[in-house]
């Protein structure tokens, strides 16, 4: 049988059809029909395969039965034939009659068996040929399938892309074909093995059959020969019979003596031969029966072989069909693979295109943000130009009035008109540029929309990347687990190091005792110096003014108080003096030429420093009248002609002070070596516990500078703790005490957080800001900090003293701001050592000691290692800063004309900026004009404020002050004078009743000057974090709000991005709660006292739910009988404004937050009833007639706020006057009448869309 090879699938035709766009649908329909046919063929092939396998198993079983029967018959033949032949030859020789027809029948049967065997051999050869053909067909089909496997896979991918819901089963077809190949290969191996075994058995049977045929032929010849001899004669028969007998029988013959045979023996022998012949005939009959049974069995075996051959033929046909189908499937598979390759290439190109589009989108967003920032800057500049234009117009009118009497003013007027014309031209250019920028902004918005449309194409790729991200997250989790184990081992090592640090602390305490002893010696020397001063004062001038004696007494008191209070503060390293400002020096010609070389060099340094009087002033507000005296104002007192004795005494005192300085310097070096060892241990602990914190290595013997660069100050600004320091005047000691906490290791920083609140109660001058890197604490955790024992805090302070070394500060690279910060202590030290030496007459002797004290403490002051000073000194400095601001108020100076010290005082007292930002502004900002002209990027680059919310706070405050101090600003109604500024006495009178309360809150206790002067003056970040957020039920975000210094100015400018990224408020419900809290503040016009008054009035009554806090809501829930569920809304954001203003917040939402089970219907009914009563009695919401479950705002809410409504902000009479100019939004009465009930929804939509407000505070 020849193998019919199926024609291969033409691959060019479908590809060419796909290439043409017109015939695409025909190829798809053809391919679908082909796939349907393949599925049908697959089903039929599977059915036929099952049938063939069943028939093959039956044939194999029958063949095994036949082989077993054949083996049994063969054994019978082997056991029976040799004996039968021997007996047959013996019996036939002696028998008289035989049965020739039986032998003929046996011969015929043998011939028939031989013919049947030949036929079977032919059939077996045909079956072999058919099996070879089947194998060839299978191989051909496998080749076709492998060739078309790629095209089939491409088709599958295409169909899946077209209709993802209805995925076809081509993949299953391919899998079935592959399994069919494997099955047929295994089946072919089994058939080959069985055929080989069968052939071996057949060859063995043929050999046995040939041997049996030879034996039968020999028996047949013997039978013929016997019959011939029996037919000849009887005698001859006997003789032949005797000859044919065996030799053993002849031995028994007996002959007579005369040679004849005995007759009795002959008869007995004949009888025996007859018996043998009968026995042989019987056995011959049995053999015939056996042969007949064997022939019938052979016939059955032939029939079974015929059926097996037919089954094999069917199997080969099915195999051929399977091979044909498999070849077709392989061709389709190759086609699909080609399609898949094409789609993969398209996918890669699309992926690259989406990546480029995404990059372009990011670039466009950045450009858009920059354009918006530039646009805002242009608007600000435009507003400033308009203000300048108004000022110029006013001046022009005044000039025109004076023109009649003052003709020389006309020239000046002409100049101003020219300047005004130039300003108008610049204004016109700016407007044109703004229009151009608006056009560009519209184009960018269009490009952004197109980019967002293209960005949607990347979603599928992002989904695929999510699996990879999950895998990476699991790997990172494993790495973090390993890292955690390493951290635990490091903690054990840290405990050992802490024990070592305790020993170093003891050594430090011993050094502190030595320092106290030295302080006593210094006190003794001070008394001696006082005596010397009295003597020298009597020699120089007998009469000393009383004021000067008071000044010297004040100095003695301050120095003595420093020495006495030295042991109270463990973190103090050296003796501190009250910090003094750098005095101004006039450039006068020196009148004394007889000074020593050392003093003359110092005088030259003072002259050089006096050429830059305000370049790097650290604290200009500290200048007093005594310090304003210059070095050369009293040079005539030290001329050689009149006062040589005083000069000699001064030189002697200077030598004694130098000796004292050397001795103290040696003691300090010994103490610093002990502190350096403790610092090394602290650095080791910090490197183990906090890997990301870069602590500077300690280098013994190096001089430690007092400043940190502006960038490092801004980037490492610590978040506020439980209570940030009260807004007292910041000394460098307290500034660096705040910054020193940042350099602590993580475990010590946590320890310091616990003791910050307790230390604040007893030591107001030691308040620190703790770094809250841990999750936000809850109010319960905050209350627990007040129960710590005092001894525990004392131990903590003593253990923390070793970590406040100046080397632990992160000193950045040197830049201009750092250099300017370095100049202040150096100038002050030189001034104190020379200027006070040659001061007034009553300070001639005492100036040496004061110069020594100031020289030794100057470098220590900026690092915050000593106490602030006496209370009188603090009050004096605070008064100086108040006087600076009051002077600006009296002169009516705009903000742009403020000098550097006034701006710094404003930042500290009015704005309440932290010390690190104040220091950066002091170094970089020299006037209000520079401050007001700074843009957002310039604030970040020049001052180093990296936090965008900090920059927003500063910009809003600057805009507020610019609008308040401009000449066009209207007077306010909160102060008696009608101005935003009030005098120090007026403000003290206003703030006297509220001073106790403010001191408890810790925000403006030390600075009562600016209470209630602005709408947001009493709502700084302290109030927001400590009071307002807990009242909203969101105390967990307190640390983030305090870290970002969020005050009331900033609340209306916070976007969704700010809340999510910087303030970590990712919960949408919490953002909604915050927004309704802001709306409540707007309704109250940001009046803190009004809010507190209304809350106090509604403490025990169900009314005015708008101002209810989270605690008040909890108490209401407890009062209605749901005490067990009340605490579940702690830190949930549920407060009165949310209940009163949110139309979507009903009793079911409250029940969900209270975690009341749904099966507890009684509690839910109680809550529903009481909640409805609460809405009816305490809010402006009322039941809707159509649905009792939904509420809407009634029409009576406008009566509470009759004057006007601006975007949901209630403006009470006179309240708009207290707002800055940027907050006075104009609106018509029609707009106020159109105010609808969807105020809350519009607010929330604005917040969720992350829009940026254009008006500013």
UniProtKB/Swiss-Prot annotation:
Expressed only in brain. GO terms for cellular component: axon; cell surface; cytoplasm; cytosol; dendritic spine; extracellular exosome; glutamatergic synapse; postsynaptic density. The modification Phosphoserine is found at residues 236, 239, 687, 689, 817, 820. The modification Phosphothreonine is found at residue 237. Signal peptide: none annotated. Residues 16-26, 709-725, 798-813 have a biased composition (Low complexity). Keywords: Cell projection, Coiled coil, Cytoplasm, Phosphoprotein, Repeat, Synapse. The keyword NAD does not apply. It is found in: Cytoplasm; Cell surface; Cell projection, Dendritic spine. GO terms for molecular function: structural constituent of postsynaptic density; structural constituent of presynapse. Belongs to the liprin family. Liprin-alpha subfamily. Alters PTPRF cellular localization and induces PTPRF clustering. May regulate the disassembly of focal adhesions. May localize receptor-like tyrosine phosphatases type 2A at specific sites on the plasma membrane, possibly regulating their interaction with the extracellular environment and their association with substrates. In neuronal cells, is a scaffolding protein in the dendritic spines which acts as immobile postsynaptic post able to recruit KIF1A-driven dense core vesicles to dendritic spines. Forms homodimers and heterodimers with liprins-alpha and liprins-beta. Interacts with the second PTPase domain of PTPRD, PTPRF and PTPRS. Interacts with KIF1A; the interaction decreases in presence of calcium. This is Liprin-alpha-2. It comes from Homo sapiens.
């Amino acid at each position: 049988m020849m193998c019919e090879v199926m024609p291969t699938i033409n691959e060019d035709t479908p590809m060419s059809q796909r290439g043409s766009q017109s015939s695409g649908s025909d190829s798809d329909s053809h391919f679908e029909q082909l796939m349907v046919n393949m599925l049908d063929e697959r089903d039929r092939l599977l059915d036929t395969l099952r049938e063939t396998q069943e028939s093959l198993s039956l044939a194999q079983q029958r063949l095994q039965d036949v082989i077993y029967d054949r083996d049994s018959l063969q054994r019978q033949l082997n056991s029976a034939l040799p004996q039968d032949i021997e007996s047959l030859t013996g019996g036939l020789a002696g028998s008289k009659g035989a049965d020739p027809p039986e032998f003929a029948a046996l011969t015929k049967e043998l011939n028939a068996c031989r013919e049947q065997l030949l036929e079977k051999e032919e059939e077996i050869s045909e079956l072999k040929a058919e099996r070879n053909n089947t194998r060839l067909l299978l191989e051909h089909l496998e080749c076709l399938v492998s060739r078309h496997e790629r095209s089939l896979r491409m088709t599958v991918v295409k169909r899946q892309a077209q209709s993802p819901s209805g995925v076809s089963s081509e993949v299953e077809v391919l899998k079935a074909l592959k399994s069919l190949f494997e099955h047929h290969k295994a089946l072919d191996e089994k058939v080959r093995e069985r055929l080989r075994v069968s052939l071996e058995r057949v060859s063995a049977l043929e050999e046995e059959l040939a041997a049996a045929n030879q034996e039968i032929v020999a028996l047949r010849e013997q039978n013929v020969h016997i019959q011939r001899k029996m037919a000849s004669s009887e005698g001859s028969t006997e003789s032949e019979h005797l000859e044919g007998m065996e030799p053993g029988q002849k031995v028994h013959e007996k002959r007579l003596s005369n040679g004849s045979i005995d007759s009795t023996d002959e008869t007995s022998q004949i009888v025996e031969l007859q018996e043998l012949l009968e026995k042989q005939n019987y056995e011959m009959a049995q053999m015939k029966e056996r042969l007949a049974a064997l022939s019938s069995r052979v016939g059955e075996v032939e029939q079974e072989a015929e059926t097996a051959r037919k089954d094999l033929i069917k199997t080969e046909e099915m195999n051929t069909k399977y091979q044909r189908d498999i070849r077709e499937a392989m061709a389709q598979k190759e086609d699909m693979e080609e399609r898949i390759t094409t789609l993969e290439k398209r996918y890669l190109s699309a992926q690259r295109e989406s990546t480029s589009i995404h990059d372009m989108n990011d670039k466009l967003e950045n450009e858009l943000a920059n354009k918006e920032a530039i646009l805002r800057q242009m608007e600000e500049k435009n507003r400033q130009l308009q203000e300048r234009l108004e000022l110029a117009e006013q001046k022009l009118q005044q000039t025109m009035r004076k023109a009649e009497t003052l003709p020389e003013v006309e020239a000046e007027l002409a100049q101003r008109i020219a300047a005004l014309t130039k300003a108008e031209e610049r204004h016109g250019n700016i407007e044109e540029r703004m229009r151009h920028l608006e056009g560009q902004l519209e184009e960018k918005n269009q490009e952004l929309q197109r980019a967002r449309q293209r960005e949607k194409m990347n979603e599928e790729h992002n989904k695929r990347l999510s699996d990879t991200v999950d895998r990476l997250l699991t790997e990172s989790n494993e790495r973090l687990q390993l890292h955690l184990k390493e951290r635990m081992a490091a903690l054990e090592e840290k405990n050992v190091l802490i024990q070592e640090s305790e020993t170093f602390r003891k050594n430090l305490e011993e050094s502190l005792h030595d320092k106290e002893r030295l302080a006593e010696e210094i006190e003794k020397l001070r008394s001696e110096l006082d005596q010397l001063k009295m003597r020298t004062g009597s020699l120089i001038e007998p009469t000393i003014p009383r004021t000067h004696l008071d000044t010297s007494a004040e100095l003695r008191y301050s120095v003595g108080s420093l020495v006495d209070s030295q042991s109270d503060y463990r973190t103090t390293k050296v003796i501190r003096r009250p910090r003094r400002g750098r005095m101004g020096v006039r450039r006068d010609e020196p009148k004394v030429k007889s000074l020593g070389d050392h003093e003359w060099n110092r005088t030259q340094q003072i002259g050089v420093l006096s050429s830059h009087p305000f370049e790097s002033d650290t604290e200009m507000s500290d200048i007093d009248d005594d310090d304003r005296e210059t070095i050369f104002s009293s040079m005539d007192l030290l001329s050689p002609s009149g006062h040589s004795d005083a000069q000699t005494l001064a030189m002697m005192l200077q030598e004694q002070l130098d000796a004292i300085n050397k001795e103290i310097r040696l003691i300090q070096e010994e103490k610093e070596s002990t502190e350096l060892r403790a610092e090394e241990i602290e650095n080791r602990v910090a490197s183990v516990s906090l890997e990301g914190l870069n602590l500077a290595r300690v280098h013994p013997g190096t001089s430690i500078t007092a400043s940190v660069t502006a960038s490092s100050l801004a980037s490492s600004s610590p978040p506020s703790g439980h209570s940030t320091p009260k807004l007292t005047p910041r000394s460098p000691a307290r500034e660096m005490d705040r910054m020193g906490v940042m350099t602590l290791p993580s475990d010590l920083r946590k320890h310091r957080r616990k003791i910050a609140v307790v230390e604040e109660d007893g030591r107001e001058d030691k308040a620190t800001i703790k770094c809250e890197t841990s999750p936000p604490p809850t109010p319960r955790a905050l209350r627990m900090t007040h129960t710590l024992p005092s001894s525990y805090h004392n131990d903590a302070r003593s253990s923390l003293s070793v970590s406040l070394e100046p080397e632990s500060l992160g000193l950045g690279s040197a830049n201009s701001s750092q250099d300017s910060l370095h100049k202040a202590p150096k100038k002050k030290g030189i001034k104190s050592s020379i200027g006070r030496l040659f001061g007034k007459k009553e300070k001639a002797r005492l100036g040496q000691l004061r110069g020594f004290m100031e020289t030794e403490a100057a470098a220590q002051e900026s690092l915050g290692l000593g106490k602030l000073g006496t209370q009188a000194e603090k009050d004096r400095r605070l008064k100086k800063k108040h006087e600076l601001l009051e002077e600006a108020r009296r002169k009516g100076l705009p903000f742009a004309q403020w000098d550097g010290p006034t701006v710094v005082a404003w930042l500290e007292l009015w704005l309440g900026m932290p010390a690190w930002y104040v220091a950066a502004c002091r170094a970089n900002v020299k006037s209000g004009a520079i401050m007001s002209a700074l843009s957002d990027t310039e604030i970040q680059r020049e001052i180093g404020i990296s936090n965008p919310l900090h920059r927003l706070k500063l910009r809003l405050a600057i805009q507020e002050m610019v609008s308040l101090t401009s000449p066009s600003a209207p007077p306010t109604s909160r102060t008696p004078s009608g101005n935003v500024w009030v005098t120090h006495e007026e403000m003290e009178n206003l703030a006297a009743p509220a001073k106790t309360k403010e001191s408890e809150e810790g925000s403006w206790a030390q600075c009562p000057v600016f209470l209630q002067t602005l709408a947001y003056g009493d709502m700084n970040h302290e109030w927001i974090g400590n009071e307002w957020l807990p009242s909203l039920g969101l105390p967990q975000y307190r640390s983030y709000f305090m870290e970002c210094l969020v005050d009331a100015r900033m609340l209306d400018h916070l976007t969704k991005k700010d809340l999510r990224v910087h303030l970590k408020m990712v919960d949408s419900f919490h953002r909604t709660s915050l927004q309704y809290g802001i709306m409540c503040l707007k309704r109250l016009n940001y009046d803190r006292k009004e809010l507190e008054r209304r809350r106090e009035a509604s403490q025990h009554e169900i009314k005015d739910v708008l101002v209810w806090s989270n605690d008040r809501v909890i108490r209401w829930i407890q009062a209605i009988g749901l005490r067990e569920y009340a605490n579940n809304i702690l830190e949930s954001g549920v407060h009165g404004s949310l209940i009163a203003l949110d139309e979507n917040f009903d009793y079911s939402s409250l029940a969900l937050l209270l975690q009341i089970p749904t099966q507890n219907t009684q509690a839910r009914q109680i809550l529903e009833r009481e909640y409805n009563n609460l809405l009816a009695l305490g809010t402006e919401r009322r039941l809707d007639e159509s649905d009792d479950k939904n509420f809407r705002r009634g029409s009576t809410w406008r009566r509470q706020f009759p004057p006007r409504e601006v975007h949901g902000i209630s403006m009470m009479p006179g309240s708009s006057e207290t707002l800055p100019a940027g907050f006075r939004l104009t609106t018509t009465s029609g707009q106020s009448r159109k105010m609808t009930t969807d105020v809350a929804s519009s607010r929330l939509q604005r917040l969720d869309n992350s829009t940026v407000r254009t008006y500013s505070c």
